[in-house]
């Protein structure tokens, strides 16, 4: 008997359109002899769209208005065997939709409330992973009220790290709101931007040399496996939003040309991060590798990475011998297995 799958896409984050592209790929890849798939697009306003508007959004990529409030439509997930929440960023990848589905008792692809929420928040990720000795660059936390009332304290923290440094909102994805700050004169503008997007901000030291950006895919629940290591190459100072989503600005190299011992260490660190954060199903774990010194630093853990057929995560497992269709099928199996 076919399994009934509810595929959620769109959402309220900056990655709404990326999610729609991923959903089109997954929708085409799930074997029709095994699954009966119903897509539902969530609008940027948080509304669950009816079938005709969902189809239009998937075909055109346009941000459609209208639809029902999420709680009014949550009951519509009843009767499905599993949900594939192909949502990125806040209100999709941060434990919110996972909490709703958990309350409803419906299995879903990906990490649960804890793994999703902690991995989405850069501060919590760093603090939890520090407890297991995960290598990370030096960083400091600042909150909006401190910046408004005691800006000299925030400036002092930046001075402790030294310049240049990065300023990042603590709980946004897709490189939104990130600034490279070359000196004290650029700090105010960067902090104002980051605090306009959230109340908590991370100040993060830069590595001594421009690092290579390495990525590893993780697949599984309590016995996860790691993919080969991939590398992103680009000319920009860092992997910002424009570089990430402008075709031709970055290239993928799978497997990354690395000494075998470095590649194996990256994979082992990625598995440690996945287990420590209590992730499930899938994740893409990103690292900085400073070739000149041999240093590795964990950058972030992405619990619902981009999922088009040309995205890094599926390409990593394709290199391991798992086709795109086999990968999405396995993710649904893992969702059903976990509960």
UniProtKB/Swiss-Prot annotation:
The keyword Cell division does not apply. Gene3D superfamilies: 3.40.50.20, ATP-grasp fold, A domain (3.30.1490.20), ATP-grasp fold, B domain (3.30.470.20). PROSITE patterns: ATP_GRASP (PS50975), DALA_DALA_LIGASE_1 (PS00843), DALA_DALA_LIGASE_2 (PS00844). Its EC number is 6.3.2.4. It holds the Pfam family Dala_Dala_lig_N. This is D-alanine--D-alanine ligase. Belongs to the D-alanine--D-alanine ligase family. Binds 2 magnesium or manganese ions per subunit. Transmembrane segments: none annotated. GO terms for molecular function: ATP binding; D-alanine-D-alanine ligase activity; metal ion binding. It comes from Deinococcus geothermalis (strain DSM 11300 / CIP 105573 / AG-3a).
